[in-house]
Amino acid sequence: MIDFRPFYRQIATSNLSAWLETLPLQLKNWEKNTHGEYAKWAKIVDFLPELTADHLDLKNAVKSDRTLPLSEGERQRIIHHLQQLMPWRKGPYHLYGIHVDCEWRSDFKWQRVLPHLAPLQDRTVLDVGCGSGYHMWRMVGEGAKTVVGIDPTELFLCQFEAVRKLLNNDRRANLIPLGIEEMQPLGVFDTVFSMGVLYHRKSPLDHLTQLKNQLRKGGELVLETLVIDGDENTVLVPADRYAKMKNVYFIPSVACLINWLGKSGFTNIRCVDEAVTTLEEQRKTDWLNNESLIDFLDPQDHSKTIEGYPAPKRAVIIANK
């Protein structure tokens, strides 16, 4: 099973130490209620070797390599274990010559977001809904002191820990399997990311307040979410599914989203990027045993979802507490 004690020791002398009042008990309770597959996935992580990279690049990619290449047997064993953790959603990873080609080219999103961020050097960062942690490693590559990701999905935790073992067992990033609503308000993070989460929330304004409660005064929020065209009063509420997703509740216009942020007490609110999701950014690969974007769009008109709504478009909003 995943051992969280190194993280507890790490934060005990940091500005995250107050979290120790609640987190250990929460994770004990979490372990008692894990999905039946979790034990199998955690064992796969145990089977993976801890490798030390001679060359580690988290600045331009998530890439590890060493001077002495893996033997073909070592390489095939690692591929086998990683494939048992499919589907791999967010990536890509380049690990000792093994290309984990995930469904999402998350490096595309990072390239859109990065130019607009306050420098992450020496920052304490929270990534809400972090998935398997691709962007967390890129944050480390930008010099962040501590990156904490939260995501309740057990498979993502095991994927993250698998990658960590192949990245020098790097402890600058840690994934905690909780949702933002379960976190005590810490109010200490320099930067909080919420990317691809807001539209899954039944109460988006509550989510914005939860994000604000984790930021220090003056800290930076990076919010990336689905949007639609329209004025400050425009919000799409799908009747049933959106792009085959049943858990999509509110898709606002950029102007409406800016209003929500202002109403939630954020300042210096600005939209820094809008981009329609392309078939190059989200697609089927050998590491995804499932449908992808092409299956969610109208086959006759890719400007619409299969349900007839506007196709996915995402905006990046940056604001301060």
Curated annotation (Swiss-Prot):
Family assignment from sequence similarity: Belongs to the class I-like SAM-binding methyltransferase superfamily. CmoB family.
Binding site for carboxy-S-adenosyl-L-methionine: K90, W104, K109, G129, D151, P152, T153, I180, E181, M195, Y199, R314
InterPro entries: CmoB, Mo5U34_MeTrfas-like, SAM-dependent_MTases_sf
Protein name: tRNA U34 carboxymethyltransferase
SUPFAM superfamilies: S-adenosyl-L-methionine-dependent methyltransferases (SSF53335)
Oligomer and partners: Homotetramer.
Keyword tRNA processing: yes
Function: Catalyzes carboxymethyl transfer from carboxy-S-adenosyl-L-methionine (Cx-SAM) to 5-hydroxyuridine (ho5U) to form 5-carboxymethoxyuridine (cmo5U) at position 34 in tRNAs.
Entries under Pfam families matching the protein: Methyltransf_9 (PF08003)
UniProt-listed HAMAP family: tRNA_carboxymethyltr_CmoB
Organism whose genome encodes this protein: Actinobacillus succinogenes (strain ATCC 55618 / DSM 22257 / CCUG 43843 / 130Z)
GO molecular function, one term: transferase activity, transferring alkyl or aryl (other than methyl) groups
Keyword presence, Transferase: yes
EC number: 2.5.1.-
Swiss-Prot/TrEMBL GO biological process terms: tRNA wobble uridine modification
Catalytic activity: carboxy-S-adenosyl-L-methionine + 5-hydroxyuridine(34) in tRNA = 5-carboxymethoxyuridine(34) in tRNA + S-adenosyl-L-homocysteine + H(+)
Alphabetical keyword list: Transferase, tRNA processing
